Amino acid sequence: MDVLSEIKKVNDDLIKWRRHLHENPELGFDLENTCKFVSEKLDEFGIENHRNFKGAVIGYINPESTGKDIALRGDMDALPVNEETGLEFASKVEGRMHACGHDAHTAQLLAAAKVLAEHKDEIDGKIMLIFQPAEELGTGSIEIADSEEFSKVDEVLGCHDGNLLAGDGVPKGALVFSKGPTMATMDKFTIDIKGRGAHGSQPENSIDPIVIASYIITSVQEIVAREISPLEPVVVSFGIINAGKAFNIIPETAHLEGTTRTLTPEIRDLVAKRLGEIAEGIGKTFRAEISYEFFRLPPPVINDVEITEKMMTAAKKLFPEKVIELKKPIMGGEDFAFYLEKKPGAFFFLYNPLEIDGKVYAHHNPRFAMCEEFMHEVPAVMVQYVMDELGK
């Protein structure tokens, strides 16, 4: 099969599907219309599919094959964001937007599925197509990854479009691969502080949760600065601080939420433990009650080295000038990691930002946009890899 030629035949459909999905975003696990659209397309392609997992569509090419089983994954959910791109196919749904590229991921997997289905007689093996919900919640892959169905898979592949690599000198249209640790954990923590409220003019009568919160916020940065090697990438960030309702009242409580990003189980455990110890120690110092919780969301994305090398070889057959190896991990997280905890695989990137008003906007921004010119590269690489591995 001439993979690039076959993919180019479906490129117009790829863009059409992506635009339809972009106009009609859905959130989390509530993807009824998206799932219906995907399932109908798979039916058109003659691909067996089911919706037995919450918010997901699973398809199979050559389901009866006893050969090697490769899973291809695309996520489908959007974000609770009001779109401000001004694109002709902008979101039609108030307060919802595909601001992280999942519309493209879904369309790209459909394109790969269509081509592979048309050439299924040339394939000695089975292909599992995972159209996944709720990546943005960090939990959409768990049910599938833990299933008996997924346990039969030998390898799993996925990709992310967009501008996650902005600022690294990566050219548009680049296909970026990483061996080993590739993306960080996406953990969350909460800290609740209970002090004693008082009038703002009488701080001596208070146990001030705002002051205590400030000590906690600054002190936990010592975990990164003084307890972990500077060669080990670690992030501790606060995203929510809630306390008080009046300018002249010291409140009784404060609430903090944040995220940690790590790349190894050992550092993950250390950060989780020390966050709690520091918060509770500061609370004790200032006579406040502390409630601390740490939520382990997606683990690190750790690519299989051999599979990544084979994916790079496949990509170089099609786009020899566009393949780049990433030498440092990205501290963003991805629930694709739950698949990689179960089976070997690889997660790669397409760098395809589109400027709005002359600027490239970050993922999750209301003006985030992607260039469609390069979107065909992802299904092309997936199909080439499958044919290299399973082609007769």
Residue ranges and their predicted role:
Residues A71-R73, F189-I191, F347-N352:
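Non-cysteine beta-strand/loop elements that form the S-adenosyl-L-methionine
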Residues E26, D75-D77, A134-E136, G162, ...:
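Active-site beta-loop-alpha junctions enriched in small/polar residues
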Residues L79, L87-M97, A104, D121-I240, ...:
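Histidine/acidic-residue-rich, glycine-tolerant segments that coordinate divalent metal ions
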Residues M1-H98, A107-D124:
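Acidic/His- and Gly-rich active-site-bordering loop/insert found
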Residues H20-N24, H98, H102-H105, H160, ...:
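Histidine-centered active-site/metal-ligand motif
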Residues E44, S214-K392:
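Metal-dependent amide/peptide-bond hydrolase catalytic core
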Residues L21, G59, L72, H102, ...:
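Divalent metal-coordination and catalytic microenvironments
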